[in-house]
Amino acid sequence: MTLVHMNLLLAFAMSLTGLLMYRSHLMSALLCLEGMVLSLFILATITTLNSHFTLANMMPIILLVFAACEAAIGLALLVKISNTYGTDHVQNLNLLQC
């Protein structure tokens, strides 16, 4: 395992740790999720380039499309929740409340 792979895995682990520690606000959770997806995208791109497997060349592009969709849906939910509740605290998102 090269130093680049170790750094990308460390970036993924730090984003996951940030998601677990700072999950009180929706915006910080979305930023940590975006960091995780971005590190996975770079890792998938490097792995695809090193493996020379031609059928796997589409995997990073598909991952990038899903990341863009995830970011758009997350920001739309953030705007809707901020307009409805006036805050972006995750604890206010209980579906059992009337």
Swiss-Prot record:
What InterPro entries has UniProt attached to this entry? NADH_UbQ_OxRdtase_chain4L/K, NUOK/Mnh_C1-like
User: What GO cellular-component annotations does this UniProt entry give?
Assistant: mitochondrial inner membrane; respiratory chain complex I
Q: According to Swiss-Prot or TrEMBL, what is its membrane topology?
A: Multi-pass membrane protein
The protein's location, in the record's own words, is: Mitochondrion inner membrane
The task this protein performs is described as: Core subunit of the mitochondrial membrane respiratory chain NADH dehydrogenase (Complex I) which catalyzes electron transfer from NADH through the respiratory chain, using ubiquinone as an electron acceptor. Part of the enzyme membrane arm which is embedded in the lipid bilayer and involved in proton translocation.
How does this chain assemble? Core subunit of respiratory chain NADH dehydrogenase (Complex I) which is composed of 45 different subunits.
| The protein's name | NADH-ubiquinone oxidoreductase chain 4L
Q: Which organism is it from?
A: Pontoporia blainvillei
Task: Please name the gene that encodes this protein.
Answer: MT-ND4L
